[in-house]
Amino acid sequence: EEALMLRMDVDANTSKLELPIEIPAYIKNVYVKYGNGSEIQTVPVESNGTISIVVPANATALSRVTTRANKEVETNNIFNYPGYGNGTIMFEDMYPALGDYDFNDFVAWYNFQIDGFYWSHNQCYAEYLMIGFQIRAIGGIYDYNPYIRLAEVQYNELDLEETQMYLERNNPEEAENIKILKGPKGELIISLKKPAIPNGYKYYNTEVNEKTKPKKMMAIYLVFNSPVNVKSLQDSKMDFYIAKTNKGQEIHLKGYSPVYYNSNESYVNEDNFIWGLKVPASLHHAREEVNFLEAYPDFEQW
């Protein structure tokens, strides 16, 4: 139960179901429990990262409820990513130079949850998305702040008033540091503010004797004013990046493009070294001035 990635009700008339969700790359099999929990299927993850579930013959019809968009939906549907614990993002902030390559210039844990999604015309839709985000460390010297771009979700698809209400309710101490922005292509961008460096220290939670404990995980609850396809809310569609203020220098993960300026930057050099790293697990960062390859020796080969 601790590693629950997906829970959903299935139409009793459905014999096979292909789910529009992404599975972390390291997972080879998922386990499907149904009925009273006494029957379990082992389902291999396909090469494209999807799974197909064969619905058992003894499926039971369940009652339905009505959504904000007056759609009938299954009552128990929930999708958690990464399923167990949190994912990790890490950045080096000296792009395009490699710097000390300790990958602790900016470190955060994240997760997300799609609650109450439903099927309509063979597509899967959601009206809510919860993103958990916790800044774990800041070992960089440059003034970067974190952002999350949902490239396939439009700013005008968000119910701003209700979203703001949830931000203030769930994050009373951090709400003013969470801003919802409209990107240059109309896309939805979440702007976050890094925490202050503790008195007497140069960095945040990276020095050997520092006693800083990260603040609790923020709960960013997005409410959509119209249904959004679940395919647009998957991990690969979330562009985590850091950027300087006033639309300055951006640093993205490999394969993602800059938001506010046109370029061919790929954020990877000719030796395949990167400036941003995302892992679907709770990864601990290296302390200051410890090379990442020393902390994680297998990283270079990978």
Predicted features along the sequence, with ranges:
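Extracellular distal adhesion/interaction modules in secreted or cell-surface proteins
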Residues: 1-302
